[in-house]
Amino acid sequence: KASVIVDVYRHKTPTHAFGIYSQERLSDANFLDIGAQGYVEKNVLNFLTGSYYVKLNSFNTGAEDEEILLNFAKKVSENLGEKGRLPFILSSFPEEGKKKNSEKFINKNFLGYSFLHSAFTADYELSGTKFKLFVIESDRKECKDMIQKYLQQTKSLEKNIAEGRYTISDPYHGEIFLHWKGKYIWGILNVSDISLRSKYLKLFE
């Protein structure tokens, strides 16, 4: 007997919905134009629409599996209203070297630190070098507080906390290069090449 199970998860904001969706999607999946974004695999169709993350699973649907899932998904999407879009801040990630659909949203404890709150990340590969970029969005006061606590946590000596670039020797993540400007902190992980990290920190601006 053929059947389809639909699970609809409502989140606090579209960004939080994207966060869970982004943790589960595969960057090389078969993506679809449904909701803000969706993808289909055998017996599975997941998509994001507004503040909702929708997951469909099919059973015994045979050769028409994908068509059946898509028809169900379209109906659900229509009933949930405005489809929204992927978080606008994702457009700030430089395109060069970025792995398509590798962007993620970490809701809390970025890098394992409670004071770093939430962050968006994306995976990169350039000339055989794999690395990760991130951006944190907050207000200016909180950004300053995050920088200060990070410096204290890693026992980095910095008397005056001001906007600009920082190099932090993190005992768990190695050297982290970041830039604070206004309500944003952005940075790069896993890069030892000075020119490469400078290039990408600049591209974020």
Residue ranges and their predicted role:
Residues 1-205:
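Soluble, non-membrane globular domain cores that form compact, hydrophobic packing
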